[in-house]
Design a protein with these regions (language model features):
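PLP-dependent aminotransferase-like
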Residues: 1-51
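Short, acidic/turn-prone active-site loops that include or flank metal/cofactor-
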Residues: 3-9, 27, 52-54, 69-73, ...
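Short, charged, surface-exposed secondary-structure boundary motifs
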Residues: 8-14, 33, 56-61, 74-78, ...
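PLP-dependent aminotransferase class I/II
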Residues: 23, 88-256
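Short, polar loop motifs at secondary-structure junctions
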Residues: 50-58, 188-191
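A short alpha/beta connector and helix-capping loop motif
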Residues: 59-70, 244, 249-252
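Active-site PLP attachment segment
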Residues: 62-107
Length: 256
């Protein structure tokens, strides 16, 4: 593991040994310049880019790029690998996708809280790391989405949240790096803001909680895990939802 700078670049003191590779995450899909910096510093042949939060960012010339479309669309499973390495295609195809669909259907039915136990159960089935090809069901669902419409809506929602909350946000954001982001990273003033939003049915996910077991107190890594909220800005929502959420954030932060 290595340390990050406040703007999520690889810390200057990080050096690679001769046989090392570097895995860099494009956090929230807003780290285009930081990714380019990692490729320049360490060489594209030694860098693997994790685009699990940056679905709409094209894969650059590097060792490999990993994608997780299920973080962006209603898919039960499946990932994508882009690489020039001679990686053989899996001989086995995933056949368990139907069993992982229940929580997605419950969300469509308007009751995401009721589906949380099924979501946890579905996640546990993905702990099997045997390489398998994407299931037929997931492929068909994936092909049914309008990717460009989703990208445009995410960009519009992100910009609207930034217009409404940017002056309050402690996270420095470069809008030129943003293209189809996972969420809007918001650094708030109140540590209980996440719980308050969830209590009002605004789902704010927690990412990288395992980092707290190894990060130093008051480090950049601890700050991003505990204090930065990934406000939802995906294609399920529009202008009114963004206004309502921004107003709720402002109200909660100003209340005592």
């Amino acid at each position: 593991f290595y340390e990050l700078t406040p703007d999520l670049r690889v810390a200057e003191q990080v050096k690679l040994n001769r046989t090392d590779w570097l895995l860099y995450v494009n956090y929230f899909g807003i780290c285009g310049h930081a990714s380019a910096d990692a490729l320049s510093r360490f060489g594209p042949e030694r860098v693997i880019l994790d685009h699990s939060q940056a679905f709409f960012t094209a894969p650059p010339d590097c060792l490999a790029t990993i994608y997780s479309p299920r973080k962006f669309f209603g898919l039960p499973d499946g990932g994508l690998l882009v690489t020039q390495l001679p990686v053989p295609r899996p001989q086995e195809t995933d056949t368990d996708s139907v069993g992982r669909m229940k929580h997605l259907l419950q969300r469509l039915d308007g009751s995401p809280e009721a589906g949380f136990p099924d979501y946890r159960a579905a996640e546990e089935t993905l702990a099997d790391f045997r390489p398998r090809s994407m299931s037929v069901l997931t492929r068909k669902l994936f092909a049914s989405y309008d990717m460009e419409a989703a990208r445009a809506r995410r960009n519009g929602n992100f910009k609207q949240l930034h217009d409404l909350l940017g002056k309050r946000n402690s996270v420095p954001l470069a809008l030129g790096d943003v293209d189809g982001p996972l969420g809007y990273p918001y650094g708030g003033k109140r540590p209980e803001l996440r719980r308050a939003l969830i209590a009002r049915r605004v789902f704010v996910p927690s990412y990288w909680t395992e980092v707290l077991g190894r990060a130093e107190r008051q480090s950049v890594e601890e700050y991003w895990v505990t204090s930065v909220l990934a406000l939802p800005c995906d294609q399920r929502y529009g202008d009114e939802e963004m206004k309502e959420m921004a107003g709720l954030v402002q109200s909660l932060e100003e209340s005592r």
